[in-house]
Structures are given as C-alpha cells and as structure tokens.
Amino acid sequence: MQALPNNLQETGAPDFVLFSSPGGNDALLGLPFNEAIDNINSIIDVLQNANPDITIIIELMAPGHSNMMTPELTTYFEQLQQGILSICEEQTSSNSSVVAVDMYTGFSDVYLADDVHYNVTGADFIAQRYYTLLATLLE
C-alpha cells in the first residue's frame, strides 16, 4: 500500500484495475476485520485520486482450501463479501465505478494448487469470471 502512490506516479494511473483477493492477506494474518475494510478503502482512494475516472473491478474473494477454512476464517470471508459489496456502493461515484466480481460462488478445492493459490483450472475459472464482466463493461 505504501508504494502504490509512487508506483502510480511512475507508471501513470490505469483506467481499469482488477483488485484481486482484497483483504485476503489481512484475513490470513488475523488482522481485525475493520482494518481489512479500511485497507481496501485506502487502496481504492489512492487509485481514484490518481484517476478520478477509473473503473475498479474488485473480487468477492474465492475461499481457501476447505481444510484451512476454520469457522472463524469462514465468518471473516463472509463478512468480507458483504463489506466489499458495501464498498462498491460507497466508492462508486458519477465518474468512477467500483464493481464486484463473484469468485466465491462455485469455487471449490479442485481449483487450488495449495491452500490459497489457484491451479491452472482455477485460473481458468477466475479468468472466465473476469472476462464475462469485462465484456459487459466494455460493450
């Protein structure tokens, strides 16, 4: 997060951002839920300040492997899903859209190479979800 403003200055602000697994590392590190939401909002704020007309596609994150999804982590993920939907509503403006893409529904252990990273089949699943949404947004 700290390097993001400088990186945007060096590279220029994008028109589209695919925001993958927002809050995922925060959840795995055991950070408080509100801190994860604040971190996601801060990243979006930096992106929108760099380009007020930006479109941000943010994931409703796929779950980790069922072996690691404790009841506490499952609750955290479910809270993130709702929090991200709220962020989309709150951060969308007349110029900038923040749109959720559902990676959670239909995702299963067969899509994972380890506890949290996609295998080739999982990458295809994720890519198809992005493609479907991007095709609609770019029409």
Task: Give the location of each predicted region.
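N-terminal hydrophobic signal/anchor transmembrane helix of membrane proteins
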Residues: 1-13, 91-117
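Oxyanion-hole/transition-state-stabilizing segment in secreted/luminal serine hydrolases
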Residues: 1-37, 61-66
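Generic structural signal for well-ordered alpha-helices
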Residues: 5, 40-45, 81, 85
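N-terminal cationic-hydrophobic initiation segments that often serve targeting/anchoring roles
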Residues: 8-9, 44-49, 88-92
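Structural recognition of the beta-strand scaffold that forms the well-ordered cores
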Residues: 15-22, 26-28, 54-60, 97-102, ...
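Second-shell loop/turn segments in exported
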Residues: 25-33, 70-71, 112-118
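Substrate-gating cap/lid alpha-helix
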Residues: 54, 61-101, 116, 120-124
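Histidine-centered active-site loop/cap adjacent to the catalytic His
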Residues: 114-139
